[in-house]
Amino acid sequence: GTRIDLSAMPPEGVMRCRAAWSRLSGRPTSVVHGNPANPGNVRITTDRVALIDWDEAHVDKSDLDLVLPHNAAGLDSASHDIAAQASAAWEAAVCWKDDYAVRRLAEVRAVAKPSISGTL
């Protein structure tokens, strides 16, 4: 995927992002647009559909471009959830310190801490 500098993000945020991205392991890779859900990036004519504004394009997991409003791409619910979490993490990471990024990170579930059990 895209190389992102996570040094400005708080450590807990970095862990949440990395955990969200790791859930995409094994999914197909392709060139992704990076922002297909923005209606301003779609141009439709009677016989064609096109995406414009490819400045965020990169090679990554295909599911990232399939997180569309109302699950328009028809992903199964588990795949949609995984992709939505990873997408929110990516958006938070690429523009950290921006209010939008902070809101997107809030959508990424916290990493579950392992419980320690046993007897002494």
Positions of the model-derived regions?
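An alpha-helical support segment within catalytic cores of ATP-dependent transferases
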Residues: 1-35, 45, 115-119
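Active-site Asp-x-Gly
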Residues: 31, 43-84
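Anionic-ligand binding region
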Residues: 40
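Helix-rich C-terminal or lid/interface subdomains of diverse kinases
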Residues: 67, 74-120
